[in-house]
């Protein structure tokens, strides 16, 4: 009997202790002080999960729609990079947060720059991952006709290279590698023009080929600007949308 009374008293003390750990703020919110140092809000405000998209067109369609009453809200569209755009709601000052509504990430191929590839792999890469233009075709033609036999050497002065290429059906000739070349790989959203940038085209003694980026990343800034301009044009009628790049 004594033990039962003791257990009941201990339980009552424990309940009283827990009650004391619940703190109410001036705004009416309740917090639980689990260890006297870490306040955890009871029943915090819930936010909808971030909507994940892959194209700029889908983002424009969503922002023009009446889903989630999005067309009536003041929102901020941020071009985070050449492959990512984020949409934020107005600041929730009560909770100290800026809710993110949408995340758009471009689906682009992983292009193996600065890596040596044999002729077949290199040709496939050029045709499948680059816009069809003059310099791409020039590099493709050179790579397709390249021939380095055992004992042959690639002449290199550090800037350009001389290599043996097939000239006609059977004859061979020395040709200088095209350098530098201006190419447009698929690196950003398809709705905007793929930015052009310079590359150094190199060959090694095994007839492997590689492209090395040579513009210092300038193309990334151009891509961000193109994305921002696209969104500004498509969403010009909605004055509640702020676009930042």
Question: What annotation goes with each model-predicted range?
Answer:
Residues 3, 50-54, 113-117, 130, ...:
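Alpha-helix boundary/N-cap detector
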Residues 41-47, 107-111, 128, 212-217:
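Charged, low-complexity surface segments at secondary-structure and domain boundaries
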Residues 6, 10, 57-60, 120-127, ...:
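Generic detector of well-ordered alpha-helical segments enriched in charged/polar residues
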Residues 65-70, 78-81, 88-96, 162-245:
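Amphipathic, membrane-inserting segments
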Residues 88-116:
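A glycine-rich, hydrophobic loop/mini-helix early in the fold
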Residues 111-162:
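Membrane-inserting effector segments that mediate pore formation, membrane fusion
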Residues 1-86, 237-245:
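An N-terminally focused, membrane-permeabilizing/fusogenic/translocator signature enriched
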Residues 46-50, 153-158, 169-174:
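N-terminal start-of-chain detector that recognizes signal peptides
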């Amino acid at each position: 009997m004594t033990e039962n009374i003791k257990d009941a008293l201990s339980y009552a003390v424990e309940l009283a202790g827990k009650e004391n750990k619940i703190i109410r703020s001036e705004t009416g919110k309740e917090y639980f002080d689990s260890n006297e140092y870490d306040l955890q809000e009871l029943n915090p405000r819930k936010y909808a999960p971030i909507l994940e998209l892959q194209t700029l067109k889908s983002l424009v369609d969503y922002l023009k729609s009446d889903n989630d009453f999005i067309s009536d809200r003041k929102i901020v569209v941020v071009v985070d990079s050449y492959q990512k755009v984020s949409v934020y709601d107005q600041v929730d000052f009560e909770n100290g947060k800026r809710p993110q509504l949408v995340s758009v990430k471009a689906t682009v191929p992983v292009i193996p720059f600065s890596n040596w590839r044999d002729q077949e792999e290199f040709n496939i890469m050029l045709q499948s991952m680059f816009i069809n233009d003059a310099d791409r075709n020039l590099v493709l033609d050179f790579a397709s006709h390249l021939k380095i036999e055992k004992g042959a050497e690639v002449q290199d002065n550090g800037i350009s290279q001389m290599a043996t290429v097939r000239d006609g059906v059977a004859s061979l000739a020395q040709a200088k590698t095209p350098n530098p070349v201006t190419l447009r790989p698929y690196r950003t959203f398809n709705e905007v023009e793929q930015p052009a940038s310079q590359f150094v085209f190199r060959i090694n003694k095994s007839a492997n080929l590689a492209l090395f980026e040579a513009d210092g990343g300038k193309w990334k800034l151009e891509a961000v600007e193109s994305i921002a301009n696209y969104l500004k044009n498509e969403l010009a009628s909605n004055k509640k949308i702020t676009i930042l790049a």
